[in-house]
Amino acid sequence: DTLFFPSGTTVYIDGGARVYGNIFTEGAHDVNIFGRGEVHPDGRGAGVWVRRSKNVRIDGIVVSQLPIGQCDSVELTNVKSISYYGWGDGMDVFSSSNVILDGVFCRNSDDCAAVYASTQGFKGGSNNVLVKNATLWADVAHPINIGGHGDPNGMDTVQNVTFRNIDILDQAEKQIDYQGCLAINPGDNTLVRNITFENIRIEDFRNGQLVNFRISFNPKYCVSTGRGIQNVLVKDVTYNGSGENLSIIAGYDLSL
């Protein structure tokens, strides 16, 4: 079942409660969802979807996935995302601005926290996204991924994105193209700029790279290359492990 909550709604999910289904905030404003209960479908998919909405606050709940699409002013605090199925991304931000993820925990079977431009019917770039005080555990793909989608016929920009005070517990990705605890891989004519990774602790992981900053063209998901990567700050990042694959920082090779 799907529950749609209109503007001005406050929802409390009590500790110990389990909601089987989806909660949608679609085209709404001033919505608050909080509590200590769980929200997830009976199977795969997002427990909560925030789409084309403004001034949404979500606190404390446990979900399967919680994507944010074409929104302004969304704040997630102390939210936990746990998924086990393919393409089980945790907290993806699509075409949105002024988004804060604070104190979240993600253990996911795909990207834990990702920031994209146009995709899945959402239009535009992403701007002013802050992820802080978070714990990320990727069973496949990336703990952090930026820029992989955009409008190949447009000029999308993903900019002013900060990841600060983050613990990365694991990465276990066999495919080189999808490795990187810290990944910036713009495609589809997207420009990524003004990115900060600060005070990040990376534990020993099973399979992957520390860093993958690469202008990419992945025909599986994109139809063109990205426009570029500009102004990236990596500060106070530590790694407590060994055996990682070689990190990659690369532009696009036109000969490929």
Regions found by a protein language model. Give the residues of each.
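Extracellular/periplasmic carbohydrate-active domains that bind, remodel
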Residues: D1-L256
